[in-house]
Amino acid sequence: MLDERAKTLLKTLVERYIADGQPVGSRTLSRASGLELSPATIRNVMADLEELGLIASPHTSAGRIPTARGYRLFVDTMLTARPLDMARSEPGLAAAQEQLQPDQPQRVITHAAQVLSNLSQFVGVVTAPRKAGVFHHIEFMRLGERRVLVILVSPDGDVQNRVIFTARDHSPAELVEASNFINAHYSGLSIEAVRERLKTEIDALRGEIALLMQAAVQFGSEAADGENEQVVVSGERNLLTMQDFSSDMGSLRKLFDLFEQKTQLMRLLDVSSRAEGVRIYIGGESQIVPFEELSVVSAPYEVDGKIVGTLGVIGPTRMAYDRMIQIVDITSRLVTQALSQK
């Protein structure tokens, strides 16, 4: 447990380092903290903070910098919340409101990623709204012996095709009968609802219809998952100009791999979508994106009161967390508003 003197010095050190990007020495702390302490006393407190793992001393400087643990304590206990005033506290957000108007979902999330990147000067990320896979219309077409083309049409007109191999050959008439039966009894239901009904109804279905139905459900589920694994990334090139990364090609390479492959990023944003409000990961806290020099500020967004995706900012641990929280929070609200309007 830190006393008030240590808290003040840690808060001052973090704020100065975020602002200047340079290790903070005892003389700077003495001036900036407003505490009337001798240099020796400040050095003793700094030594205690370093022993607690809250600050560290770079080899090239006598000053100190915050560690991920120090940033976490700062964010959790010392951060002063800024007012959510788009016009006065963050003028760029007023312009963002003009960009994030009701539109096609893909355009909204693309604009949102750009807004996050432009305002933060870091990387903006937005996951596409999750869609519940729904059976609308299905057709089976014979391609050859034991080969069937499955054509799945979504409620919004998207068409997905897949070739499946069946246990026996089916005539065109059988395939038409199967598709007519499925469309008549299951159209309009979610993939999950169809899956649950099949558990109880499969014994009553004719063998060929049951097998084709199972293949259709599997295909529909995979198609829906594929649509939901979309993330828009904007501003990756901003990392090239940050002193925190620009001189470390190894870290840059790992970061660009993260943005290109997107699998880890999707997992992290999926976890974030289960939290209410803004969530902050500092350094390797998430264990999904284990970069000690990286922080993620994220928040879920909704459509008609239901969480359907996540957005956020990715940048160095040396970021102005109060400002990033505000940018992410308001952008989340604007996206929610844009997607919820009919």
UniProtKB/Swiss-Prot annotation:
GO terms for biological process: negative regulation of DNA-templated transcription. Negative regulator of class I heat shock genes (grpE-dnaK-dnaJ and groELS operons). Prevents heat-shock induction of these operons. Belongs to the HrcA family. One of its GO terms (molecular function) is DNA binding. Pfam families: HrcA (PF01628), HrcA_DNA-bdg (PF03444). This is Heat-inducible transcription repressor HrcA. InterPro entries: GAF-like_dom_sf, HrcA, HrcA_C, WH-like_DNA-bd_sf, WH_DNA-bd_sf, WHTH_HrcA_DNA-bd, WHTH_transcript_rep_HrcA_IDD. It comes from Methylibium petroleiphilum (strain ATCC BAA-1232 / LMG 22953 / PM1). The keyword Transcription applies. Keywords: Repressor, Stress response, Transcription, Transcription regulation. PANTHER family: HEAT-INDUCIBLE TRANSCRIPTION REPRESSOR HRCA.
